[in-house]
Amino acid sequence: MPRKPTPEEIETAMLALVTERGAGKNLDPTEVARVVGGDKPDEWGPLMGLVRQVAVRLMKQGRIVILRKGRPADPDDFRGIYRLTLPPSPEA
């Protein structure tokens, strides 16, 4: 049985992936779970709750944005399918 990734490992992967994707592009949170957990659904699927918790914390810190239906979501109250992206640059 593979070991469970830490929140710090998930954060590192999440920030790397959204940065790699670049401004104006977004990321499916399952991609983060797959990077840290593995390609099989029974490996990455159980990590989705922790991925969401890390995403909420990073959004509250202003380091990423959680999108729901293409718009920034309330980190304390969103449901369903969501995406991750970089916050707008200060020059924008």
Language-model features, listed with the residues they occupy:
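Short acidic, hydrophobic short linear motifs in intrinsically disordered regions
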Residues: 24-35
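Long, charged, low-complexity intrinsically disordered regions
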Residues: 3-7, 88-90
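Positively charged, polyanion-binding regions of nucleic-acid-associated proteins
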Residues: 5-26
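A short, conserved structural fragment
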Residues: 62-68
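An alpha-helix initiation/capping motif
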Residues: 8, 30, 49-52
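Short, cationic-aromatic polyanion-contact patches
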Residues: 69-92
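Basic amphipathic alpha-helical segments that dock to polyanions
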Residues: 57-58
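Short, positively charged loop/turn segments that connect secondary-structure elements
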Residues: 37-53
